Amino acid sequence: MEIDNSGANIFRRCPLEYYESALKPTQEGLGLEPKPHGFEVSALDLGGREHELLEEYYNELKGTPIQPYPESLNEALEMEAQLIITAYRAKYPQEEFEIVDVERPFRVVLPDLCPHCYQKDMLKNIDDKQFLCERCGYFFPRGRHTYVGKIDVTFRMLGMGVLDIMDHKTEKRRSNSNRPQKWAARDQASLYLWAAKAIYKPEEIGRFHVNVLKRPSEKFQEPPIFPDRQTLERTPEQIETAVRDLVFIADDIERYKHIFGDKITWPSNRENCDSGWGQCDFYLPHTFGWSEEIRENRYQPKKPYLKLEGIPIIQP
């Protein structure tokens, strides 16, 4: 299966939420997301539009300008997105690094770990389709999972030989979702550094940078701000553990799909339905039950945020 950070994190939080957001059948495909109301500016839509504007900006700085993306039909969203990118350009009129790549989508095959012991040191090649784990006597297929995502900016610090990568995160003014303590513990830095090593080999990969864009206040009385970029390093052991954990999650998702499918309600983590600072996107139907009215008025088919058509699969 193909798995990204968002899907893995949602499954960790609640398998039933993962099913609703990634696998629930719709006429357009798989998965549901909340439907914006009127001119509401959703965090997901604003983040997507901001990524388009940042892609234009960094390609401009790189010297390879691209055709501008169409403006959003949501006037409130477009106004806020333009306000943020204008302030961002003023904050960073130039960068002190060489831009190598912008908005790079990727598909990297995850390691073949035995689904019983999650080790790879005693694998025996049986044929081009399967391995035998001599530790536990278990046969399993090769290449069962692929890690997918998009690296926002790949760059080389001036005078340095290694490549660093940067990820942009847009959040509300008072949010603490991207504070340094959270990023110090997150797996994304480890996983992206692992993927970058495969994508850009034989280049040496250095550090992961978090670039937070804080939205203006709700009534626009305070402008957007951009905290100092966070710089994260990871040890080989941290990277190896994060990759192993992702393989484990992907195996669990496949196991749940086999056991529960579309006919039986998936297990859920009810402790996370209401976290104290917000509710799960599917709190209403999971608490009071699905109805046609809730489905039509509250949800829409999920829009894919990764365009992976034609993106080659890379072996690490």
Model-derived regions, located:
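Catalytic cores of nuclease domains that cleave nucleic-acid phosphodiester backbones
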Residues: L53-S175, A198-R207, P316
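Residue-level detector of short, conserved catalytic/binding motifs and their immediate flanks
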Residues: I151, S190, G278
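Short small-residue beta-strand/loop micro-motif enriched in glycine and branched aliphatics
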Residues: G29-L32, R173-S177
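Active-site-adjacent bridging/hinge elements
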Residues: Y19-G29, V162-K169, A250-R255
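Nuclease catalytic cores
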Residues: E2-N59, E103-R104, S275, Q279-P285
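Short amphipathic alpha-helical face segments that pack within enzyme cores
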Residues: R49, D187-A195
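Metal-dependent nuclease catalytic regions and adjoining charged, substrate-binding loops involved
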Residues: H116-C117, N125-D127, G143, Q181-K182, ...
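Short alpha-helix boundary/capping segments
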Residues: V41-D45, S177-D187
